[in-house]
Amino acid sequence: MLSSNAAAAVADAETETADIRAYLSSQERKTLLRFLTCGSVDDGKSTLIGRLLYDTKLIFEDQLAALEQDSKKHGTNGGEIDFALLVDGLEAERQQGITIDVAYRFFATPKRKFIVADTPGHEQYTRNMATGASTADLAVVLVDARQGVLQQTRRHSIIASLLGIRYIVVAVNKIDLVDFDEQVFAKITADYDAFAKDLGFSSIVAIPMSARHGDNVTRISERTPWYAGPSLIEHLETVDVAGESVAQPFRFPVQYVNRPNLDFRGFAGTIASGSVAVGDEVVVAKSGRRTRVKRIVTYDGDLPSAFEGQAITVVLEDEVEVSRGEILVAPEARPDVADQFTANIVWFDEHPLLPGRMYILRTETDEVSATVSQLKHRVNINNFAHEAAKCLELNAVGVCNLSLQSPIAFDPFGKNRSTGSFILIDRVTNATVGAGMILHPLRRAANIHWQALDVTKESRATLKHQKPAVLWFTGLSGSGKSTVANLLEKKLHAAGRHTYILDGDNVRHGLNRDLGFTEEDRVENIRRVAEVARLMADAGLIVLVSFISPFRAERRMARDLMGEGEFIEVFVDTPFEECAKRDPKGLYARALKGELKNFTGIDSPYEAPENPDLHLHTVGRAPEDMADELETWLRERGYC
Amino acid sequence: MTANLTHLQRLEAESIHIMRGVAANFSKPVMLYSIGKDSSVLLHLAMKAFYPAKPPFPFLHVDTTWKFREMIEFRDRMAAELGFDLLVHINEEGVRDGINPFDHGSNVHTHIMKTVALRQALDKYGFDAAFGGARRDEEKSRAKERVFSFRTASHTWDPKNQRPEMWKIYNTRVAQGESIRVFPLSNWTELDIWQYILQEGIPIVPLYFAKKRPVVNRGGMTIMVDDDRMKLLPGETVEERMVRFRTLGCYPLTGAIDSCAATLEDIVSEMLTARTSERQGRLIDRDEAGSMEKKKREGYF
C-alpha cells in the first residue's frame, strides 16, 4: 500500500511525464524558418542576432558571464554588453571586431523554431555570405540608418535573389542615431524598393530598429510612434515562406547504391521534390529506362509512399542500371538531360573564372568535368547593367554557357533548388571556386552527333609502325624546349617515324594569332593546341608540343583529352636566372625593363609540374644528350 | 511539402543524407564514437542510413584510459549488440609517460591522450573522412564550422579560410593525406538530441541519469571518484550525492550536477529550465580564452 503522500507524488510524476510529452509534441509541430542576416560592414548584423538570443532568453548564465567578461576585453560599447561577441566566435573575429565567417544560431519562440545564419559584411568574405544564404528562405538585410543603401547592401540582395530567396526584411538599424527620424526611414525604404524591384522578391518588409537597444526587435518601440508595422520577431514568426508552392514533379537523386547481399539492391537518397508510392512508374533520367517502384525501405519499416524531404531507399521492379548521379523521376514530367546549358555563376576564388579552363562540376549527387564555353556577361552590382567581360573576378556574378564532358540531368534552378544547382571545384587545389544556378539547357548540344568512322586511331598508327603520343614540353621561355624538341624530331624522323612539332611561337602566327598574353588568352591558347595535338595523335602521329604552358590546370586538361598513356609531360627545368642569362630572343631584357607585360616568371606565374613523366635538368647538359635520353625512353616503352 | 515532416524528421533526414554522401564519396571513412549521448544518436542514425546493410565504415573510440568505467562497459555492450566494427585506439606513448589529468592538468592530458591520439589513429588507418558528433549550438567556434570541414595533411583546421558550402552540395575532394571532418548533427540542439533519444528509445550510458554517486568538490566542480587512481587532496571528503552528468568525458575533468532526474522525461524537463549551458561541466573549455577554437585547429574534434 502506498501512503497517500507517496501516491500523490507518483500521480504528480505521472502528470509531469504526460505534460512533458505533450509539451514536446507541441514543439515537434512547430514550423522552422531558416533566415540570414546580411548587409554591409558595421550595420549591426551580429548585434541583432545577439539581441534576438538575449530577448528570447536563450543565453545561459555561464554564457552571459563570459559575455560580460568579453565585452570588457574586446567590446566596442565601452564596457556595456556587446551582443556581437555572442556570435563572433573566432579569435580573429573578436580581435578585429569583424565577422569573417557565417555563424549558425538556433532559437525558438512559442510559435516557431529558427535557424539564423549571421553572415559577414566585408566584400572579401562574400562567399561566406553566400554559404549562409544558400540554405535560407528569408534574408534580413541590415541598413545603417546613417549610411543608407550601400554597395554591399546591393551585392547581398542580388546574391540572395540569385540563390532563390524570395522574402526580404529591410532592417533599418541604428534608428536611434538619427533621432528616430521617420523621413530617414522613408527615404531608405524608397531607395531599397526602387533598387530591388527587378530582383523578383515576393515581399519586402522594412522595419526601423535599434538592435543595440532593442527597439522593434522583439517588442514595438514607443520611440517610433510613426511606425505601424510588426516587430521583427512578430514578422519572422508569421511570415509564410512556403507561399504559393505548387506541387512539384517527383525527383529522387540517387546518392548511394545499397547492396549488402545478392538479394537486395536499393537506391538510397533524399526526395528533392514531389512524392512517390509503391507501384508508381518512374524513369531513370539519363538512360530513359522505365520501371516501377517495388518497395520504399526504411529502418522503421517499409512505407506505402514518401514525399519531399524524406531520406529513403527505393527498390525497383526491374534490374535496370542506376548509379550515383542518376535521378529517378516522374515519367510525365522529366528533367532536362544535356551536356551544355546556361547558368548564373557567383565566383568565390582569388583566381578568376577563365573561359576554356576545365573545372569539376558537382551537383547534389553527380560529378563531371566542365568548362565555361562562353562568358556571356558580368552583372554590374550597382545598376544591374550587363557588361562584357573576359573573366569573372572574386565575388563577381555573371551569366555563362557551360560545356560538360558528359550530360547531367537537371531542372532550371527557378523550378527546383536541389536539382538546378551546382558548384565548381578547382582541379588542382580542390577549392570550391564558384556556385551555379542553371537557367536553361542549350539545344545545340543535341544536334551535333558524333560521326562514327571506320578507320581508327589504332589502324592509322599500326600502318606507321608506331604508337601515337603527345610529348608535352613545358618550361620557362628560353629553357630549351624547342631546341630539345627539334633535335628529338630529327632523330625520330631519321628512324622513319611520323612526327610533328607544335611550337608556341609558330602557332601564334596562325591558328592563335588573335590571342594575347593575358591569363584568359593563355588558357585558350593551350586549349586550342591541346585539341590540335589530340587530332594529330588520332591521326597516329607522335606529336611534340613545345609550349611554356605555365598553368597546371591547363596541362591537366590536355592530359585528360588524350588517351591512356598518350600524354607524356616533359619538364624542361632551367632556373629563371639561367633563362634570363641565355635570353636567346632578348625577351627577358625587355620584360625586366617593363616593356613586355604578363611575362612568365616575371609578372605572370609559372606553376612547375609536380610529377612530370620526364624531368630534364638542363644546366650543364648538352641538348643532344637530352634528346638521346628522350628517344631511349620512348623506345623502351614501345612508342617507336 | 517539407512542412509535413516534423522537426525531428527533418533533422534525421538531413543527417542521413550527409552520411550517405560520405559513404559514396570517400574511400575510407570512419565514425568517431565517444560513447556520449551525441555519439549514441550518431550511431543510431548510421544504423538507419544504411539499413538493411550495416554502416559501411568502422567506429573508432579514442580511449584516454580515463573514461568512466560505465562508459567502457556500455561501449563494449553496444558493439556486441549492434555488431558494428569497433576500433579502440590508445596513445601508448602517453600511457608509457604516465600522462594523467591530475599531475599534468587538463590541457596537457587532453592534448596528448585525445588530440594527439586521434591524429595517430587517423594516420595509422589512413582515414580520409571522420564523422564527429559536434553540434553548432554547443560552442561559439563550432557555430562557425562547416558540415564538411577540411583538414590539412597535418590535421589542422584553418577557420579563416573554410570552403564555401552551398545548399546540400558538399565538396568531398581531398588530396593525398588530407581529410574531412563531417558533422551530421551540426543543426541539432541539445534539446533535439534528448527529444530524439526519447522518441527513438536510444540506449545511453546510465551516468546521464541521477543516482547516488561518490563525489568530491574540487575547483568548483563536482567530480566523481570513479576508481582509486583519484587521490584525495587535504581537506577533501567523499560524499554520496544524487548527481548526474550532462556531458561525458574523462571522469576527472567532467563535472556532475546535483539532480533527481532519473528518467528521460525528467532530464528533458530539467533541461527546459536549465540556466547554464552543457559545456559548463567541461573543464577543458575554460582553460584559456578561445580554447575550443585552438584545440580544434590542432585537430581536436
Swiss-Prot record, chain B:
Enzymatic class: transferase
Pathway(s) of this molecule: Sulfur metabolism; hydrogen sulfide biosynthesis; sulfite from sulfate: step 1/3
Sorted UniProt keywords: ATP-binding, Nucleotide-binding, Nucleotidyltransferase, Transferase
Gene Ontology biological process terms from the UniProt entry: hydrogen sulfide biosynthetic process; sulfate assimilation
Record-linked InterPro entries: PAPS_reduct_dom (IPR002500), Rossmann-like_a/b/a_fold (IPR014729), SO4_adenylTrfase_ssu (IPR011784), Sulfate_adenylyltrnsfr_sub2 (IPR050128)
Catalytically driven reaction(s): sulfate + ATP + H(+) = adenosine 5'-phosphosulfate + diphosphate
Name used for this protein in its record: Sulfate adenylyltransferase subunit 2
Native source organism of the sequence: Chelativorans sp. (strain BNC1)
